[in-house]
Every structure is written in structure tokens, then in C-alpha cells.
From Swiss-Prot:
Subcellular location: Secreted
Protein name: U11-ctenitoxin-Pn1b
UniProt KW Secreted keyword: yes
Expression sites (tissue/organ): Expressed by the venom gland.
């Protein structure tokens, strides 16, 4: 089972397809940057290749 675009994730490898990465936008809050949560988002071929390496099943 993998996560579709827009679903909440913790890691790139959880997101379906190679052009789907776990993206964490940041919000300004009280003078500090903090993550507002990560979700699977469309990405480019560079990340695609990186993800293939990183996410190979052991």
C-alpha cells in the first residue's frame, strides 16, 4: 500500500510512483519555522531517480 498525492506522509518512500515525493511546507509561527505536516506531492525526474535508489526494497 502506498500513498496518493495529497495524503499525509513521513517519508518519500511511502508515496506512490516515482514522481511523487513527501513534501513538507513550512509555516512562520511565533518567530520560528515549523513544519505544518508533510504530504505526497508531484516532483521532477531528478527526485524520481534519487527515490528509486533510496527506496529500493531490501
Amino acid at each position: 500500500a502506498c500513498l496518493a498525492r495529497g495524503e499525509t506522509c513521513k517519508d518519500d518512500c511511502e508515496c506512490c510512483d516515482c514522481d511523487n515525493q513527501c513534501y513538507c511546507p513550512f509555516d512562520w509561527f511565533g518567530g520560528k519555522w515549523h513544519p505544518v505536516g508533510c504530504s505526497c506531492a508531484y516532483t521532477n525526474k531528478y527526485v524520481c531517480d534519487h527515490k528509486k535508489e533510496k527506496c529500493k526494497k531490501a
